[in-house]
Amino acid sequence: IGQIIEMIKKIRNSNQELDEGLLKAFELEKMFDKQMRTLSGGTTQKVSAVLAFLFNPEVLILDEPTAGLDPLASEILKEKIIQEKNKGKLIFITSHLLSELDDLITEIIFMQDGEVYFHKKVATLKAETNEAKISKAIASILKHKSVNPNQQESHKALKAIL
């Protein structure tokens, strides 16, 4: 782990202050002598998260950031994401675990079958569906879609107009 982190620091060759908060929170310094190929999926995910935040980027793209993490590590990472969001950073998160997103996101782009199904503010989505959780709000929309077969045709027509 230590070699990977040091190698990335050297490659980036940046004079900026490094954000080692996750490194300490995940207690990865204790594992610096371990080789990446010997790590569990969760520990590998922690290393990836540390590297994503290390150089204090203005934009973060996180693909399934909590996948493979234990509950404590997941909460640590979500707290870090919220801290960075509160600093005004732009953060994109892809996730199939919608329950993980409730405290993290303000907007949602929901894709289905490789197409954007909708793009809304989370508050609007919850208000329109009268649901408090993102996963339930989306399930409500999808359930309504399956009841209304004409919606797919109107969606195609809307796409053609745009």
Question: Where in this protein do the model-derived segments appear?
Answer:
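Conserved ABC ATPase "signature" region
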Residues: 6, 14-31
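Conserved ABC ATPase signature
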Residues: 35-42
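Hydrophobic anchor residue at the start of the ABC signature
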Residues: 49
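Helix N-cap at the start of a conserved alpha-helix in ABC-type nucleotide-binding domains
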Residues: 71-72
